[in-house]
């Protein structure tokens, strides 16, 4: 009888603890002005609380009259005293948002929180109407800056950015635009093209293999 009682009591305390944690994170999200909506999402990783958020961004930070759009961001909350890893995705982020088993490597290594930011003009972060004039590196960096400065007051440990492929390039760009926002940047791959036809590899592609293979 006593054993069953203490088991039930332990379960009750666990439920209350998780509920209190959820309420605390959700209160923070409600307090952040840029966050205009969020929903809790389930992941295989039970050590973090995951939320898919909508963040209101200016289409053109230099011209607020141009309007706004909603950008999708995922928060994986580990603890306010833990580091924060910002994934500067260069494209759409459905693979991270929808996969229950997605885990970013640095987040796991550092036992960190995660902010996964989908790039503007991709998937669920596409403005309506879709005016491509506002898809610039400078405007995209302002998106990240707005998100990071909105969350920094709540997470006081170290901040890192990371990305792969175009996300790696984006991580480099962000470091150049706002070096004081982050403590470290870890671009896994960061291709930097000089032009539509870069000029550094075309001559190789014109010679490699046989003519039939190239054609």
What is each stretch, according to the model?
Residues 21-112:
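Catalytic-loop region of hydrolases
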Residues 182-215:
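A catalytic-pocket lid/entrance helix-loop region that shapes and gates access to the active site
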